[in-house]
């Protein structure tokens, strides 16, 4: 058991030597000694210990004082077994409240020492194993997040046809998110724009996000015409997502196909937030869409699109509900009212400035509160 590092803290040299002998008899040879709490904290700062056997009554700094200091940084604190007389039960209870794993009477009974120290070391081993698995999982999820973010476009200067400017951002609530956006140059001189939101969270939603993005890109190439109908594109994607959808995973989407030269295009909304029109007037939601189900919810559904015209200087703001439903610590929503108030002063700004203002406004509102939904914004403006 030489790999187990122990620290014995007691102001009595007799107790220290007796406990060290008891530990050696049980195979624990890597034992460091400390006379009081101050020395103990210095030893703990200098190296890693698997367990600390800590006396309660000591000069300089007693056992309770040591535990209070260790509690300030519990992630690096070793397990502690308190050494105490049975008459000090109230202090023992206080030590347990401060994080001590167990206590040991000063008789240092060998069977009891073996049982309690063994139990504490086993719990530490299991915790260390769980921590390592969590670390590996977090590293894998971070790699998945990086891979996922690499799927969506970022170089909008090469995507946007002449006369159009595009910007977008996506912030997963977890390492892997279910939102997506797409900005795709079409062979006929137009552009495809899409924001979508997968039901569910985490890795399953991330996999569906990648599948949906692939289906939309493939459908955009399959649908005939220089400006493929967004309804036909979403119908193709729906056929893929609705088939054998045992997990009941759905994807809301808003998809626009726009001719850069004329500003004429079409839009199809499948259970998603309608885009905002940005111009000199107050921001307003595009209207006139038929209510249509999310992708994956209704196999064979005949999606319909509506005509859309974007005049010079006008812009479109597409977003996921992670923006309007962002929550602060009081669980209040950011809401459409705040969104519209935020958009009003930047309605004529560049798409990049609108995206930046949106993310800044949401971040200010939530003020560090953890979010449960992804946040995605895409803005296009006709020059």
Name each model-derived stretch.
Residues 13-32:
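Two-component/phosphorelay signaling modules centered on CheY-like receiver
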Residues 131-315, 367-383:
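… and, occasionally, acidic/histidine-rich disordered N-termini of signaling adaptors
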Residues 234, 254, 306-318, 323-383:
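C-terminal catalytic subdomain
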Residues 104-106:
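A Lys-centered signature of the CheY-like receiver
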Residues 33-51:
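Acidic, metal-coordinating helix/loop segments flanking the phosphotransfer/catalytic sites
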Residues 14, 35-39, 57, 62-68, ...:
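Acidic catalytic/metal-coordinating carboxylates
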